[in-house]
A protein has these predicted regions:
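Binding/recognition "hotspot" determinant
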Residues: 1-176
Length: 176
């Protein structure tokens, strides 16, 4: 039978797996997409009576517009199978390690499989946003106050498939 560990963390003093079929150990990427827009505007109207009998009206207004966009595929918690001491993993068919950690904290773990597939994950987290605003236009201030905000981030990382303190045997031959 096959066994699959996705987004899991297995830790034991000793690991002794015998998998008749395939063993898949896969880290999961958290994903999100952001596509936002905001618009706002306002008009204020005030009427003031002064002590000398004069009065005046004071309309004012403001406008703002902004957009934000983002995209992320990121491993926050790498899947792992870790023996504190010794271990053995025998896989009848294919061992697939996708961005996960397999190994031991101390003594070596022996891993045997007909085929070993190793795949690293490319993670990214990108985003940007801006906002433009005009405000403070009134009878006394005909030139508006302006506001411009911009922010962005662009991160990348590799989540590597990793074997720690292991001897890996593929189809009878030790591999690195």
């Amino acid at each position: 039978e096959d066994a699959t560990f996705k987004g899991a963390n297995v830790t034991a003093d000793k690991i002794d797996f015998e998998i008749g079929g395939n063993l898949n150990v896969i880290s999961l990427q958290d994903e999100y997409k952001l596509n936002g827009e905001n618009k706002s505007g306002g008009i204020n109207y005030g009427h003031t009576e002064q002590s000398d009998g004069k009065s005046y009206n004071s309309p004012s207004g403001n406008l703002s517009y902004g957009e934000s966009k983002g995209d992320s595929k990121w491993v926050n918690n790498q899947t792992s199978i870790i023996a504190q001491n010794v271990g053995s993993i025998k896989v009848g068919e294919t061992l697939t390690n996708v961005g996960a950690i397999i190994g031991s904290m101390n003594d070596s773990v022996r891993i045997e499989a007909k085929e070993v597939v190793v795949e690293n994950l490319k993670d990214h987290d990108n985003g940007k946003g801006y906002n433009v605003g005009l405000s403070g236009v009134d009878r006394k201030n005909v030139v508006p106050q302006t506001e411009l905000q911009y922010g962005s981030h662009d991160k990348e990382q590799d989540t590597n498939a990793t074997f720690v303190n292991t001897v890996v045997i593929e189809n009878g031959k030790e591999i690195n």
